[in-house]
C-alpha cells in the first residue's frame, strides 16, 4: 500500500515550520520515537545517534582523509551505522578513501537556484573586460593574483573583482583588483552578468564549486587550472578553458578578455546548455539513490 512521503529536516531553526510540505524542526527537539525509513546526515556520522534507522546515508561536502575522519570522531559511528556516502561529483567520488566509503558511495550532483536558471541572457551583449572570482578568497588566491598581474599588462582596461574579506595591497590596487560588495543573490547575479570571465585556479578542497556553476548558468566563460572539482565545471574549448600551467592560465584569460568573437562563441555554447539541471532533477536523482518507490 502506498504511503505518503513525509520529509523532516532537523537543523537550528528557531521554531517548527512547514514549507512546501517539508517539516523543519530544531535538532534539539527530535522525537526519538520517530522511526524514519531513510536517514541522511550532513557531513557528520555522529548525527546518526539521534535517530534509529536501517537505511543511513552520509552526505559529504568535503574531502576527508582517514586521519581527519578519526580525528573528528566519526569512524566508530560510521562503522556502527554503515551509511552509504552521497558525494557531489566525480572528483569527490574518485578521491574518497575506501575506508571512509566502505558501505558504498553514490554521486548526487546539485544545482543552482532558480534565479540563475531563469535569468534571461542577452546573447549579443559584450561586457567590459571584467573578470570575477566569487569563491572563497583563500583558495589559491596567490596564484590568481600573480597571474592577474601578468594579464593586466596585456589587457590594460581589464578589472578583477574578488570576494571579501581580503586585504588589497598597493600592487593589487594598481592592477585594478577590486573587492566585491557582499550582498544578496540579485547583486551577485548583476556582478556576474557584467563580467566577461569567471577566473579561478580551483582548489583541492572544492568538491562542487557552486560559484563556478552559477557563473556557467549565466553563460560566463570559465578559465581554471582544473584543481579539485573545477575540471567538471568546464568543457575545454567549448565553455571555457582548463590550463595546464600558469602561462596557459594567463593566455586563455587574455584571449577571452581581449577577443570579442571568442567570447561570443563561448557564450553561444553556454546558452545551449543553460537550464539543463534544476532541483527537480536533483530530487529525482536522490529518490533513485534512496530507492524510494514514487508511484
PLM regions and their residue ranges:
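Extended catalytic core of nucleotide-activated donor transferases of GT-like folds
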Residues: 11-82, 91
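A short, active-site helix/loop in glycosyltransferases that binds the activated sugar's phosphate group
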Residues: 67-69, 81-105, 117
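Short beta-strand->alpha-helix junction loop in the catalytic core
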Residues: 91-92, 107-118, 166-168
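Conserved catalytic-core segment of nucleotide-activated headgroup transferases in glycan assembly
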Residues: 114, 123-185
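Short alpha-helical segment that forms part of, or immediately flanks, the ligand-binding pocket
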Residues: 189, 212-217, 231-232
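Acidic donor-binding loop of glycosyltransferase active sites
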Residues: 193-207, 220
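Short acidic/histidine- and often glycine-rich active-site loop of Leloir-type glycosyltransferases
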Residues: 227-237, 241-242
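A charged, aromatic-enriched C-terminal amphipathic alpha-helix characteristic of glycosyltransferases
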Residues: 244, 261-291
